[in-house]
Regions:
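C-terminal non-catalytic scaffold/interaction domains in large multidomain proteins
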Residues: 1-182
Length: 182
């Protein structure tokens, strides 16, 4: 809970100065700890995680906006989807993708666009090229834990694949996708 940082929900309501250190750390420390433990994530998801660490079961929309405004601007933020990256990581250089354990799932909206692109590139390389559908099926299964692709996950996978092509990390030949030569 947020007690590890000496912060409480009451601190938020009483105008807590997020930049001032408490006896155990600051809100910035909390944000950095979450990012270092879980990797980059969209700002909305990061704010929800911070709220949970402060003891909130649900994070209301006004509270969510309040927490998003307090995310340190010194962290790298991907302009494409607003994902926030751990200290020392830059969104345009980030090359990690985290697989899920069998039988578990990740919320599609908790994963940064950059990580989804990396997962697609990783799968494309391992398959030495494949159709969009084949690549996306493997990514949905291995990196998100989904056996089916609903419209929202499909939209995310399409956007990530298109970004991978635009970034020059993938080559498209019709519906067939190949890894770019590095």
């Amino acid at each position: 809970d947020g007690s590890n940082y000496g912060l409480t929900v009451e601190d938020l309501d009483n105008g807590f100065n997020f930049a001032v250190s408490s006896s155990h750390g600051t809100f910035s420390d909390l944000i950095r700890d979450i990012l270092e433990a879980e990797g980059p994530m969209p700002a909305r998801w990061l704010a929800k995680r911070a709220g949970q660490e402060l003891g909130l079961e649900r994070v209301s929309e006004p509270r969510l906006r309040q927490l998003i405004r307090k995310i340190p601007l010194s962290l790298s933020i991907d302009p494409r989807d607003g994902s926030v990256f751990p200290p020392g990581e830059k969104y345009d250089k980030f090359r990690k993708a985290y697989r899920v354990r069998r039988g578990t799932q990740r919320w599609y909206n908790s994963v940064s666009l950059a990580e989804t692109i990396n997962a697609i590139v990783t799968v494309t390389r391992s398959l030495r090229g494949a159709t969009r559908d084949e690549i996306q099926r493997v990514v949905a299964s291995k990196f998100f834990g989904y056996s089916r692709r609903g419209s929202k996950i499909q939209k995310l996978l399409d956007e990530a694949m298109d970004c991978g092509i635009e970034d020059g990390r993938l080559n498209a030949m019709g519906d067939y996708i190949r890894p770019a030569r590095s």
